[in-house]
UniProtKB/Swiss-Prot annotation:
GO biological process: intracellular protein transport; lysosomal transport; protein targeting to lysosome; secretion of lysosomal enzymes
Name of the protein in question: Cation-dependent mannose-6-phosphate receptor
InterPro entries: Man-6-P_rcpt, Man-6-P_rcpt_cation_dep, Man6P_isomerase_rcpt-bd_dom_sf, MRH_dom
Segments on the Lumenal side according to the record's topology features: 22-186
Pfam families assigned: Man-6-P_recep
Disulphide-bonded residues: C33-C79, C133-C168, C146-C180
Organism lineage string: Eukaryota, Metazoa, Chordata, Craniata, Vertebrata
Any GO molecular function: retromer complex binding
Known glycosylation sites: N58, N84, N95, N108, N114
Description of its domains: The extracellular domain is homologous to the repeating units (of approximately 147 AA) of the cation-independent mannose 6-phosphate receptor.
């Protein structure tokens, strides 16, 4: 009886530990972006853009600006919490002089849209201003520009707009290939003409070969269309080059002239008569 009792206790303990582990895993599951608006009425375009940025979810970006006591560090993550101290913070500002952390924007108030070669990611719901912008909540605007040579780089703060009564924001920029539009390849005019020429040559050779073989009944090299012309093409090209390039006539007249029979005088037979014997 005692062995069975110990076995049951072990199994119950294992089941209890498994239940606790599952519960803890649910609790520590990372939060993700929650688009502005009701869950069932979210923009399909915004959902598609967030899915497009998924390769950046596990990356963290940091940039430090300022000097001395005015040195600030900004930590940014895409649809993930950027801080362990502030719940839901997607972009935080840390004052290096006193390590004070300020939430610039939270991922539970996300808005995103894009253009041809850029994506604008906005985190709302940050910490409230103390004395600026009507004490409204801070807002982070991250401009992701197209750069086909990097997945994500060059995260930098650009400016802080807090001189207005409302709608203030922090502006940041970053480069990523995910913001680029798909490349559409177009053939140049020369390539199109080359393809057309090659197609015509192929049709000429194949069609002429079939005609010579099936209609004319030619065999061997005679099946090639216009064989005599192509065999004599070299001579034709040479004659054309000779005609265009030569500056002197091919047949230069001789420096002497022949004498015609009509120009020869009649030889007198009497001049030799004195040589005959008397």
């Amino acid at each position: 009886m005692f062995p069975f009792s110990g076995c049951w206790r072990t199994e119950l303990l294992l089941l209890l530990l498994l239940a606790v582990a599952v519960r803890e895993s649910w609790q520590i599951e990372e939060k993700s972006c929650d688009l502005v608006g009701e869950k069932d009425k979210e923009s399909k375009n915004e959902v598609a853009l967030l899915e497009r940025l998924r390769p950046l979810f596990n990356k963290s970006f940091e940039s430090t600006v300022g000097q001395g006591s005015d040195t600030y560090s900004y930590i940014f993550r895409v649809c993930r919490e950027a801080s362990n101290h502030s719940s839901g913070a997607g972009l935080v500002q840390i004052n290096k002089s006193n390590d004070k952390e300020t939430v610039v924007g939270r991922i539970n108030e996300t808005h995103i849209f894009n253009g041809s070669n850029w994506i604008m990611l906005i985190y709302k719901g940050g910490d409230e201003y103390d004395n600026h912008c009507g004490k409204e909540q801070r807002r982070a605007v991250v401009m992701i520009s197209c750069n086909r040579h990097t997945l994500a780089a060059n995260f930098n703060p650009v400016s802080e707009e807090r001189g207005k009564v409302q709608d203030c924001f922090y502006l940041f920029e970053m480069d990523s290939s995910l913001a680029c539009s798909p490349e559409v390849s177009h053939l140049s005019v020369g390539s199109i003409l080359l393809v057309i020429f090659a197609s015509l040559v192929a049709v000429y050779i194949i069609g002429g070969f079939l005609y010579q073989r099936l209609v004319v009944g030619a065999k061997g090299m005679e099946q090639f269309p216009h064989l005599a012309f192509w065999q004599d093409l070299g001579n034709l090209v040479a004659d054309g080059c000779d005609f265009v390039c030569r500056s002197k006539p091919r047949n230069v007249p001789a420096a002497y002239r022949g004498v015609g029979d009509d120009q020869l005088g009649e030889e007198s037979e009497e001049r030799d008569d004195h040589l005959l014997p008397m």
